Design a protein with these regions (language model features):
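Internal catalytic or translocation cores that form aromatic/hydrophobic pockets or channels
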Residues: 89, 93-108, 118-122
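His-Asp-centered metal-binding catalytic motifs of divalent-metal-dependent phosphohydrolases/nucleases
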Residues: 55-74, 84, 106-115
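Active-site flanking loop/helix segments enriched in acidic
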Residues: 15-34, 67-72
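Divalent metal-dependent phosphate-bond-processing catalytic cores, especially two-metal-ion Mg2+/Mn2+ enzymes
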Residues: 2-6, 26-32, 36-51, 97, ...
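N-terminal glycine-rich anion-binding loops that anchor highly charged ligand groups
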Residues: 11, 33-34, 53-57
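Short alpha-helical hairpin
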Residues: 2-20
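An active-site-proximal "capping" alpha-helix that borders the catalytic cofactor pocket
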Residues: 38, 79-94
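Alpha-helix boundary/capping segments in eukaryotic regulatory proteins
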Residues: 28, 48-56, 72-80, 99
């Protein structure tokens, strides 16, 4: 469902229609609606910040950002962010999108759970993270009007238990490869769900390396 919020909408193109269809068919309704909301929050953030970006590519980055959590795109040993980025890369390459744009979308997905870095990079990279941080963490909640938030949620519902359901979805998507959470926020997800989880400690890795000193 495409809506127009203060001039922001999903571009009606063959590329975006295919993206919508692929994500709807591959991801759960929870992830599909989450990713759709991420696009609107990201695009509105871009509007407020006066950033220039390609709306089709932003839509791709937002919609594919959690595809690494799906069975179809989840690898055995890569971070889920990389899996999603690789899925987007394969899709865009099949449509002969230029390599620079593919690389930008790849980075926007790969870095979307890395706080403090994306906002200093290409607008598309910054905005995918901005959308995710708004929908999952609510970090910029006051920056959107009640009307904007409600319109987005009406079109793409959060449901009554989104907070717990998204944490569970994260866990289900990464529990088979907990080693990929070293040094990133998803270690908190594993720890929340698995009391036996013993995350790698950065200082311990240093001290236990094969170096003599």
């Amino acid at each position: 469902m495409s809506i127009n919020i203060d001039g922001i909408s999903i571009p009606d193109t063959a590329l975006t229609r295919e993206i919508t269809e692929i994500v709807r068919d591959t991801a759960s309704p929870l992830l599909f609606h989450h990713s759709s909301r991420v696009y609107y929050f990201a695009a509105l953030a871009g509007q407020k910040r006066g950033l220039t970006y390609d709306a089709e590519l932003l839509y791709c980055g937002c919609m594919f950002h959690d595809m690494g959590l799906t069975h179809q795109h989840s690898s055995a040993c890569e971070r889920f962010e990389v899996d999603g980025a690789n899925a987007a890369k394969t899709f865009l390459a099949s449509h002969r999108i230029n390599q620079q744009d593919i690389d930008t979308v790849w980075a926007s997905i790969a870095l979307h759970t890395t706080p403090g870095i994306p906002q200093h990079m290409h607008p598309l990279i910054a905005l995918v993270t901005a959308g995710v941080e708004m929908d999952v963490l609510g970090l910029t909640y006051p920056e959107y009007s009640d009307e904007q938030r409600q319109a987005i949620v009406n079109a793409h519902p959060r449901g009554n238990r989104f907070k717990e359901e998204i944490i569970q979805a994260f866990y289900e998507g990464i529990k088979h490869k907990p080693q990929t959470t070293f040094g990133n926020v998803k270690a908190d997800v594993i720890a929340d769900k698995d009391p036996q989880f013993a995350p790698l400690n950065f200082c311990s890795v240093i001290r236990n390396s094969q170096w003599d000193s």
